[in-house]
Structures are given as C-alpha cells and as structure tokens.
C-alpha cells in the first residue's frame, strides 16, 4: 500500500506542462516548486539556485513558487496567498507567480530538490571551477530586495567600519538542532569549544579585535560571549534554545514571525 501511495503521490506532483491562458506566447516558464516544511531559508536558496540553473539550461524562464506549499517562512494562513521568496529576493528573471497567472506555456517542476550535481552543495568547495560557476550563477539570479541591501550596508557602515583599520573576524555557527539531528550527507561543524579555539588562533594571526557572530542558537551565543566578553558583535536580536529533536525553525517561529526572523537571519548572513 505504501508503494502504491508513493506512486500516486509522485504522479500527481510530477513535472508537467499546463496552459493558464494566452499571455506571453513566446515565453516558456518553469515554476520551481519544493515541498519541505522543515527546511530553512538557505536550504531553499541552494536548491532554488540549482533549479534556476537547470531551468535556464533547458531554455525556460524560471519562476519560484514558495507560496503553494507549507514552508517555515510562512504562517499557516499565508500558504497559498504569499510567495515567501518575493519577500526576500527579487524574481530571478523578472517574473513572479502573479505575472504568469495567465501565461500560455508553463511547466510545473517536480516538488523535490535537484539531484546533487545540479545544486550548490559542499562539494563545490573542493572544485574551484564548480565554485566559480555557482558564484556566477548566484550573482546573476540571486538578488536581495533593496530594503535588505540597505540594512546590510547600513550596519556595515555604522558598526563594522566605525573604526578604520580595525579587523573583525566573521563567524557563522549552525544551531544545535542541526548538530543533534545530523541530517544525512550534510557536513557537521566542530563543537563550540573547537570553534572558540580556532577563533583565538585566527584573531591572533590576523590581529582581529572583535568577532561578528551569526547564530540563532542561544547556547552557542552564551558560550562565545563567555569566551570573548565585550568582543562579540551581531545583527541578530533574538536567539533560540531547542530541545532534543526540535527544529530551530519551530522554536524561532513560536516567538517571532517567520518573515521577521528569516529577514533578520538573511541580513546577518549578508553582513557576514
């Protein structure tokens, strides 16, 4: 029964071509979809970038749909009404879901992420040519909304560049929920103690006086604050403590709106 159910599911959500109207008869649109209610914003960024690259390679105009399936960037009542992607990024090729609502040639993509070789995963750090390709793809199609760009530039100017010549070490730490769950085929960061030791080593080597820390995890934040009192900078205002097995998206969305939380995280990464 399980196998039959999966076959039905895969058939319903297969790649298929539809006609929604007669507009844009000379364009072929590819709607990028993904069903993943536990994946974070940057997981969607990586897989969407891969799907954009593949759609363009096949001669389509990519359009991202993060509206018609639940994801951690939307409140339950926003599903089907708000495209989460458009809150943070510009459309990759200028067209939104709303723009193509009456388009003639539309292909709906499968709801699973691209195969490993079609999206930027950690293997690219071992291949300079692949890294350069994904960097070029991101620069072309991954454009932040102007308001996010302004906040990034403002923080850098007011905080990081306040003292000319001062060196600040940038550090990103994934949450302990990621470390506890140990998702298959994902790289694991060192324990916080090892991160602290490496920070001390790099700060000494390069003469850094402060650390810009990007993390949503309260435990990691507390450990870093204790190790480097008065030296930690961060754009983020809130952090979260997860229990065993709890997803940090759920913990964060319980105290802050998904939009505000993910915008804050996106800006903090942009600053980094």
Predicted regions located by residue number:
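Secretory-pathway glycan-assembly enzymes, especially type II membrane glycosyltransferases
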Residues: 5-200, 205, 221
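Donor-binding and catalytic core of enzymes assembling or modifying cell-surface/extracellular glycoconjugates
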Residues: 207-272
